[in-house]
Amino acid sequence: MQIDISTLDAGSAGKAELPEEYFAATPRADIMARVVHWQLAKRRAGTHKVKGMGEVSGTTKKPYRQKGTGNARQGSLRAPQFRTGGAVHGPVVRDHGYSLNKKVRRLGLISALSQKLAEGKLVVLDTVAGVSKTSELNVKLKKLGWGRTLVVDAVVDEGFARASRNLIGIDVLPVVGANVYDILQHDTLAITAAGLEGLKRRLDGIKAGANEEIAA
C-alpha cells in the first residue's frame, strides 16, 4: 500500500510504500496491553523498601514476663503491632522487569503502527532536517494541527531535537527507540522516509530472529 509523503510545510513530496504486513494488520489490543505493561514494569526503579521486625532498631528484651500481668503476652517491642515495630511483608528492593517473548513485542509494535494508520493518524515526512529554530517549528506544527506528536527518524537530527525540546506535545525518537507505549501516548505518529526504511529493517530483523531491544 502507498501513502503520501508530506513536508513540514504541509506540502507533498511523493509517495512511500507501506508493507501491509506491518501497517495493515488487525490491531490486537490485548497484545498492545501486554507490551505496555512489560515496558512500564521495566521502567520501575524498584527502590521501595521498609524495615521488617529484624531490621528496626530497639531492644530484643522481652517487654514483661509471660504470665501474671493481665496483659496479652508479648515477646518483642519490635513486633509489628507496636508503634515502633517492623512492617509485615512490606516492599523490598527488587526488579519489577520480566521477560516477554520477542514475537509478542513485535506483534505489539505492528499493532500500534496499524492502529495509527487505521485512525488516519500516521504521517510520513520527507525529512525533519533543516529546522533548527523553536519558533519556526512551532509555527509549522500549529499549521499542521497534529496535536501531541511523536516523530520517528532513522537517527535523531540534532537541530530538530533542539528545536522541539522546548515545545510541549512533541517528542522525537530514533527507529531503535520506537515503542508501543510512546506511539499510543501520542495523537499523531510522524515517521520520516529514512525512519520508515529503518523501521522496516528493524521489523524484518525481528522476524528473521535478530536481537532486538525495545526502549522502555
UniProtKB/Swiss-Prot annotation:
InterPro entries: Ribosomal_uL4, Ribosomal_uL4-like, Ribosomal_uL4_dom_sf. Keywords: Ribonucleoprotein, Ribosomal protein, RNA-binding, rRNA-binding. Pfam families: Ribosomal_L4. Gene3D superfamilies: 3.40.1370.10. GO terms for cellular component: ribonucleoprotein complex; ribosome. Residues 47-77 are annotated as: Disordered. One of its GO terms (biological process) is translation. It comes from the Bacteria. One of its GO terms (molecular function) is rRNA binding. Part of the 50S ribosomal subunit. One of the primary rRNA binding proteins, this protein initially binds near the 5'-end of the 23S rRNA. It is important during the early stages of 50S assembly. It makes multiple contacts with different domains of the 23S rRNA in the assembled 50S subunit and ribosome. Forms part of the polypeptide exit tunnel. Belongs to the universal ribosomal protein uL4 family. This is Large ribosomal subunit protein uL4. It comes from Acidiphilium cryptum (strain JF-5).
